[in-house]
Amino acid sequence: MNFPRASRLMQAAVLGGLMAVSAAATAQTNPYARGPNPTAASLEASAGPFTVRSFTVSRPSGYGAGTVYYPTNAGGTVGAIAIVPGYTARQSSIKWWGPRLASHGFVVITIDTNSTLDQPSSRSSQQMAALRQVASLNGTSSSPIYGKVDTARMGVMGWSMGGGGSLISAANNPSLKAAAPQAPWDSSTNFSSVTVPTLIFACENDSIAPVNSSALPIYDSMSRNAKQFLEINGGSHSCANSGNSNQALIGKKGVAWMKRFMDNDTRYSTFACENPNSTRVSDFRTANCS
């Protein structure tokens, strides 16, 4: 008999059991934790562990149009995220985030604005209106998301002027749990009042909202929150949009950030806070993230 080998197998079994117990303990102690322990592969995949369905909002209230994506089998209630596109753009530009985030345990609404020419402040107002309507649908028995949303846990995302709108939403609504603007633009770069954990996706070769006059000074202006700046190497203004070639990297970061701060799920801390150390990233900065 090979006792050393048997001993090693027993040690491995014990270690595996302890890890399973630890994962279960994390889920039990955090009422917001949803899904299995994350891995790099699971976060880089095009879909998470939950099945996703969607529906079009029949009567948008305070914004142009909306599509809601939601997990069917997450168990319990989940947080909600509103995502708004940029100047002249429609929700198709950011729709990839809908099923991606929903498959990891969020209710997500992607919206069209009343006018494609709306400015960041208007985009913020419409984004918050969309979140209010999600909360209303959560209380409507005929709604597909009836009883599925924890209305105390909400987040915002957006691209370009929608990113600027998301930053305004974060500044004006400190109860939001997380924000993730991509290639953000606003007439002001001072968001020093923001306390909401904020992840900024920037695009190195952005000629519409140049990094050094937009995303970076916005990041530098903030000091009261967990924050992160991730710049895509060689990326144009649409480097984080639907159809981009960086979805594995950006999706991993975006999902991990929302899970860490909207769900208070520390299983995602490493993925949310660490430097990806990828050739696709030309600049990375972070502070107060754990």
Swiss-Prot record:
Consequence recorded when altering residue 214 to H: Displays increased enzymatic activity on PET bottle
Cellular compartment(s): Secreted
Endpoints of the signal sequence: 1-27
One Gene Ontology cellular component annotation held by this UniProt entry: extracellular region
Subunit-structure text: Monomer.
Record GO terms (molecular function): acetylesterase activity; carboxylic ester hydrolase activity
Domain of life, per lineage: Bacteria
Domain comment quoted from the record: PETase retains the ancestral alpha/beta-hydrolase fold but exhibits a more open active-site cleft than homologous cutinases.
Induction annotation: Highly up-regulated during growth on PET film.
Family stated for the protein in its record: Belongs to the AB hydrolase superfamily.
Pathway: Xenobiotic degradation
Keyword annotations: Disulfide bond, Hydrolase, Secreted, Serine esterase, Signal
Activity-pH dependence: Optimum pH is 9 for PET film hydrolysis. Optimum pH is 9 for PET (commercial drinking bottle) hydrolysis. Optimum pH is 6.5-8.0 for BHET hydrolysis. Optimum pH is 8.0 for the hydrolysis of pNP-esters. The enzyme is active at pH 6-10, has an optimal pH range of 7-9 and it is rapidly inactivated below pH 7.0 or above pH 9.0.
Annotated binding of poly(ethylene terephthalate), by residue: 87, 161, 185
This protein's name: Poly(ethylene terephthalate) hydrolase
UniProt effect for mutating residue 87 to A: Displays increased enzymatic activity on PET bottle. Displays decreased enzymatic activity on PET film and on BHET
Top EC category: hydrolase
SUPFAM superfamilies attached to this UniProt entry: alpha/beta-Hydrolases
GO biological process, one term: xenobiotic catabolic process
Catalytic residues, chain numbering: 160, 206, 237
This enzyme's EC code(s): 3.1.1.101
Major location category of this protein: secreted
Hydrolase in keyword set: yes
